[in-house]
């Protein structure tokens, strides 16, 4: 009798785990298939506004005229933990350049958690802690980190996700190319107006 009981338990447990596996697989497939970017290279930055950790405002409008790098993150995300030091290195490289703006925006993570992580990891990137996905979902539906590089006019020129995450050399090259492209457009505009040209 006991052996019959064990056999039945094994049978039903097998069915349970098979069904559980199917359920998990379908959830993963749904997440992957549903996960896409709402904005892509060539699109304009969506209209958003957030408060930074120093109390100042960051918005689409405030980024106009600057080459911008934005990262969406969560401090418990392993890929974000790898990407944030890269963004920190980039931030330190361009901190003195007023033409470049680099910011981090959390996805569903509050001020206390983000501030604690920043302090423990010696990060100085300006950030905005967002308790929800309201701002994040203007850019994407799933997946972090998300890194966007934008021109002075708000056009997104490159986007990186977690597969693979962006490297410092890639981001630095993107920023330099975008700075040079913006300067080229500025020169073209000045020439078309027959005004003295100054390359920034």
Enumerate the language-model features and the residues they cover.
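C-terminal motif of bacterial Sec signal peptides marking the signal peptidase cleavage site
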Residues: 23-26
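Short pre-active-site segment immediately N-terminal to redox-active cysteine/selenocysteine motifs
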Residues: 66-68, 73-76, 143
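Conserved redox-active cysteine motifs that mediate thiol-disulfide chemistry
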Residues: 72-89
């Amino acid at each position: 009798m006991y052996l019959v009981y064990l056999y039945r338990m094994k049978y039903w447990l097998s069915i349970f785990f098979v069904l559980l596996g199917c359920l998990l697989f379908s959830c993963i497939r749904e997440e992957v298939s549903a996960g896409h970017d709402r904005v892509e290279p060539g699109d304009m930055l969506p209209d958003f506004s957030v408060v930074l950790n120093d109390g100042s405002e960051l918005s689409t409008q405030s980024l106009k005229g600057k080459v911008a790098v934005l990262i969406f993150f969560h401090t418990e995300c392993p890929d974000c933990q790898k990407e944030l030091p890269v963004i920190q290195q980039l931030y330190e490289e361009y901190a003195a350049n007023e033409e470049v703006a680099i910011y981090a925006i959390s996805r569903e993570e509050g001020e206390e958690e983000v501030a604690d992580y920043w302090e423990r990891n010696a990060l100085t990137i300006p950030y905005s802690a967002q308790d929800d996905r309201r701002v994040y979902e203007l850019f994407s539906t799933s997946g972090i980190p998300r890194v966007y590089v934008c021109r002075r006019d708000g056009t997104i020129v490159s986007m990186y996700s977690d597969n693979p995450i962006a490297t410092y050399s890639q981001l630095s090259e993107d920023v330099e190319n975008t700075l040079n492209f913006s300067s080229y457009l500025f020169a073209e505009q000045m020439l078309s107006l027959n005004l003295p040209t100054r390359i920034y």
